[in-house]
Amino acid sequence: MKKSKWMLGAAALLALSVTVAGCGGDDKKADSGKGGLSGEVMVYTSIYPDIIDNMCKPNVAKAFPDMKVNWFQGGTEKVITKITGEIKAKKIAADALMVADPSYYLKLDEQKLLLPYVSPEAKNVISEKDKEGAWTAVRISNMIIAYNSDKLKPEDAPKTWEELTDPKWKGKIAMPNPMLSGTAYVAVGALADKYGWEYFDKLKANGIRVEEGNSAIQNKLLTGEYAAAMILEENILKLANTKNEPLKVSYPEDGVVMVPSPIAIFNTTKNPEGAKALVDWWLSKEGQEAVVKGWMHSVRGDVPAPKGAPETKKLVEGANKVDWKKLADNNAEIKEE
């Protein structure tokens, strides 16, 4: 399925993953039993650094005062590359994983690397989850179409994914690089399933630009370099609500591409009880409210959507179906497309 290499010509990866939160020693203690949860838990995640720093760290520290939670943060593909290397070396440092590519969890489960755990909070989850507890969605991101309302009237903005192939948008549209972005990778797979690979041939012919990530796209939407773009809903909601920027979301009539980001525990963890408690926290109302404060959607049905977004249940009902098994089995081919 190597029809072209155009996505490989995108901007080089600039942002480096960094380790955030406490350093501390390498040894991880198990649960201290009667004394409560203790030791350390290492989480590898693609969730945004500001959410970790401003919401996760203080709330998790309050919930687990005797347990140290460390966070390794990077883009989904960067985190996957790191953990894949550790798996090959048989030195998995992570206790838990949170990245925006459910298909990768299927691979990990097939390799029998995950510790099944059905959280008591899982009954409230309306998003996707493994019935055996290998992984459970913890946040929802949506790939949508965005535009600058200072440059484009709402009635003139693209209303469907197919409209992006219209010649009137030639050279004025963009998308994130699926080689670097897990959500963009999922969007490529979902839209190829819906419209065929010819859809991306048409986008290429229409001069679509492939950017390093969502931040570069939103900046160029603001300057007017792009008229419209595939981008994460959360980026646009944050700018519109916190900085009063004129960026708007056009929710495609042919469905958003919904990307649940699961959490899973590696069966190599030295602190399984601590890792399970962290899963419980993320799936709790408190943890999910932190997700929504980061402008993403909660996986729970009883937590409202972020400001300016439709209710999550409505988006779930109309979202494009994603074949996670197909994505897992055809990872290299999809990225080379």
Across the structure, where does each feature detected by a protein language model lie?
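C-terminal capping/gating helix-and-loop segments adjacent to ligand/active sites or protein-protein/ligand interfaces
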Residues: E289-E337
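Short, low-complexity disordered leader/linker segments with a strong preference
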Residues: M1-E40
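Short, polar/charged alpha-helical segment
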Residues: L37, M42-N70, K78, I145, ...
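Extracytoplasmic ligand-binding site segments that recognize negatively charged/polar headgroups
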Residues: T45-N54, F72, T76-E77, I92-Y226
